[in-house]
Design a protein with these regions (language model features):
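AMP-binding/adenylate-forming catalytic core of the ANL superfamily
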Residues: 203-290
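AMP-binding/adenylate-forming core of the ANL superfamily
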Residues: 179-207, 212-213, 267
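Conserved pre-ATP/AMP-binding loop-to-beta segment of ANL
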Residues: 3-20, 53-54
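Active-site glycine-centered loops adjacent to acidic/histidine catalytic or metal-binding residues
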Residues: 24, 130, 153, 204, ...
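Gly/Ser/Thr-rich phosphate-binding loop
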Residues: 116-168
């Protein structure tokens, strides 16, 4: 989809836009988003980041997905200037024009910016969504004093409903007027009076700090019940970030003794027995009873169209 394609759909007689979920937590699905909801979401973001008619916005994501669609709607709402470029990882490699006030990027693009500070300097503010921000990327952006934010949201909420300043905050703060609480599972419940959906119950395990602040821990879908101990893979992944220099995630496999046990899945074709044994020992030292019992190597991780890693459990 091009910007013109989206604008044609935006200005047609329908009161909704067709969108696709990312598929990171299940099969991608087609949903209809009310244009009024998209405008309300855009206004919340524009208010939070001071986006107005004099702002210059960069569209570097495909309008096929909600993040790209919402950048266009933000520009429409604010009457801001929008520049669209090809949505590839090597961001701003050949761009030498005026700097931008605001852009939404995925983690792979943010990594490119962190590796090329001269390009990052052309963006006053970036929001990073579509996948988790790795500890390594967070550290790089913090060292560069980037005005960068990790976002929390989903297609169903018309993009993000909360943001976290990378390198400074450990918790997310909602965009007004959204408020949050937790259900009996410890999962986030978001109340959004400005959107027609009203309330969304998620599968994200959180610590609620206030009605507008929460700390994200991980997905309940990924949680591992090992001998009565609840293990949240995303927390382990953050704790061991300094032990690996390749992509990895914590998966699980069945165990006749413990029910389930964690497994470290690593994207590599080159791991010697010596390296494997040393890594398992380091994991036991770092994580104790939560440590993975096995290391599985994959030549390449499966990804969704938006670049999220698809977790595959051992069976």
């Amino acid at each position: 989809m091009t910007v013109d394609d989206f604008l044609a759909e935006w200005h047609n007689a329908d009161d909704f836009i067709t969108a696709h979920t990312s598929g990171s937590t299940g099969t991608p699905k087609v949903i209809h988003l009310l244009k009024s909801d998209m405008l309300a979401s855009a206004r919340a973001t524009n208010a939070r980041f001071g986006i107005g008619a004099r702002s210059r916005l960069l569209l570097c994501l495909s309008p096929d997905y909600i993040a790209g669609k919402m950048m266009i709607v933000r520009a429409l709402d604010a009457r801001a200037r929008l520049t669209a470029i090809e949505p590839h990882r090597d961001l701003l490699a050949d761009y030498h024009g005026d700097p931008f006030d605001f852009a939404a990027v995925i983690p792979a693009q943010a990594q490119t910016l962190a590796d090329h500070p001269d390009r990052l300097a052309r963006l006053a503010t970036i929001i990073v969504g579509g996948g988790p921000v790795s500890p390594e990327l967070e550290s790089k952006l913090a060292d560069l004093n980037a005005n960068a934010y990790s976002t929390y949201g989903m297609t169903e909420t018309c993009s993000h409903i909360a943001v976290r300043r990378i390198g400074i905050d450990r918790h997310y703060t909602t965009l007004a007027p959204t408020t949050v609480s937790a259900d009996s599972r410890g999962c986030l419940v978001a109340r959004m009076p400005h959107l027609s959906v009203g309330e969304v119950t998620t599968n994200d395990i959180v610590d609620i700090l206030s009605a507008t602040e929460f700390r994200w821990r991980g997905r309940i879908d990924n949680a591992i019940n090992s001998g009565g101990v609840k293990i949240i893979p995303e927390e382990l992944e953050r704790e061991i970030a300094d032990l690996l220099d390749v992509r990895y995630y914590i998966g699980r496999r069945p165990s006749p003794t413990w029910g389930e046990v964690p497994v470290l899945v690593v994207e590599t074709t080159d791991m010697s027995d010596r390296r494997r044994d040393a890594l398992l020992a380091a994991l036991r030292t770092r994580l104790g009873i939560r440590a993975p019992r096995q290391i599985v190597t994959l030549a390449r991780f499966e990804e969704t169209p938006t670049g999220k890693v698809v977790r595959v459990d051992e069976r």
